[in-house]
Amino acid sequence: MKLTVQPVDINYISQIWPLIEEYLQEALTKDNGAPSWSECYNIHHVQAFITSGVWLLLVATDEDKTIHGAATVSFSNYPINRVAFVTLIGGRMISSQDTFEQLKMILKQRGATKVQGYGRESIVRLWKRFGFEPRTTLVEAKL
């Protein structure tokens, strides 16, 4: 099955939300070795981030326009790089070189020079095939 990765215009978020919510909820609740996102935000916060334009929503569709996965991306500007950070990813999204190339093109069109994201070990192994390298270990303490 050939998947097409595409951004969702902010004006259509409410229309497709029922079709993608389960993919993002799955990403929130799946243990991925990253911080417990449920302590930071829930699915309602995610929807607010997307509908307000803070996060970009991407979907993966087949030839019949059926959605098979969804992802969200935030952007951070640093002095030397504009980093696209994959905040959530669920379903079948970036599982092949082709879908990764599509993701890269979309992020480059939005000015990104790097892409980053947290991932459990299986995602790290998969994404290493696409040129990702583990960068650091995140540590955290409650204040």
Regions found by a protein language model. Name each.
Residues 1-40:
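Short amphipathic alpha-helix that is part of the acyltransferase structural core
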Residues 34-54:
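Active-site rim helix/loop that mediates acceptor-substrate recognition in acyltransferases
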Residues 51-94:
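Conserved donor-binding loop and adjoining core beta-sheet/short helix segment
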Residues 81-130:
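Acyl-donor binding region in acyl/amide transferases
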Residues 15-26, 48, 105, 125, ...:
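Charged/polar, solvent-exposed surface patches and flexible loops
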Residues 118, 133-143:
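Conserved catalytic-core motifs of GNAT/GCN5-like acyltransferases
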Residues 2, 83, 136:
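A residue-level signal for beta-strand positions that form part of recognition/binding surfaces
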Residues 54-55, 129-133:
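Short glycine-aromatic motifs
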